[in-house]
Amino acid sequence: MQIILASQSPRRQELLKRVVPTFTIAPADIDETVGKDGLPAEYVAQMAAQKAAAIAEQSPEALVIGCDTIVALAGEILGKPTSREDGYRMLRLLSGKTHDVYTSVTLKQGEKERSATVHSTVTFYPLTDTEIHAYLDTAEYADKAGAYGIQGQGALLIEAIAGDYYAIMGLPIAKVARLLKEFN
C-alpha cells in the first residue's frame, strides 16, 4: 500500500518514519486561513481533513495522512508567524502563560477516513525581551505554529508540558499508529 504524507514539514517526516518506514511526500496546497475565527480544535481538524482530501483526490488508491498543528491562547489561534515582528508578538503573548496546542491527523484512503485531534498544553517561562530576540535570532520560529519549536532551542522557553510531546512537535505518532491499524 502506498502511503503519502501530505506535509512538507521535516519534523513530521522524521516522526512518521518511526511508524512507517516507507512513504512519499506530497504537500497539500490549501488555504489555511479559512475558518481561523472558529474554535481551535475544529479549525485544526478541518485543516488536516482538507490536506488529506486534496492529496487523496489526486491519488485515490493511496493512504494519505494529512495533519495540522496550531497554538491557541485564550481561544485565539496563533498560526505560523508572517514576520519576525509577528513572531515577537506571539512569543510576548505566550510569555509566562499556559497555552493550548492542538494537532489533528486525518488518514484517508478512497472513501474511508479516520481522524483524531490531540490536545496538549505548554507553559512558557516569563520571557525577557532579550530572551525573545535571542530565540528569534535562531530563525526557528519562522515555520512553526505559535512561533516556536519544542524540539529545538524553543525548549529553553518552556517551563512545563502536559500531553503528547510528539503532537506538540507536529505528529502524534502513537495515535497515527493506532489509526493505521484500521487500514491494514
Swiss-Prot record:
Q: Where in the cell is it found?
A: Cytoplasm
Q: Which UniProt keywords apply?
A: Cytoplasm, Hydrolase, Nucleotide metabolism
EC nos? 3.6.1.9
Q: By its UniProt entry, which InterPro entries does this protein fall under?
A: ITPase-like_fam (IPR029001), Maf-like (IPR003697)
For this UniProt entry, what is the primary localization, expressed as one broad class?
cytoplasm
* Disulfide cysteine pairs (residue numbers): none
Which cofactors, if any, are listed as required? a divalent metal cation
Q: Which Pfam families match?
A: Maf
- Entry annotation: catalytic residues: 68
Keyword match Cytoplasm? yes
Q: What start-end ranges are recorded for coiled-coil regions in this protein?
A: none
Give me the segments passing through the membrane.
none
Q: What Gene Ontology molecular-function terms does this entry list?
A: dTTP diphosphatase activity; UTP diphosphatase activity
Q: Which GO terms describe its biological process?
A: nucleotide metabolic process
User: Where does the entry annotate site (Important for substrate specificity)?
Assistant: 11, 69, 151
Q: Which GO terms describe its cellular component?
A: cytoplasm
As for what it does, the entry says: Nucleoside triphosphate pyrophosphatase that hydrolyzes dTTP and UTP. May have a dual role in cell division arrest and in preventing the incorporation of modified nucleotides into cellular nucleic acids.
Q: Identify its protein family.
A: Belongs to the Maf family. YhdE subfamily.
The entry's protein name is dTTP/UTP pyrophosphatase
Q: Which organism is it from?
A: Enterococcus faecalis (strain ATCC 700802 / V583)
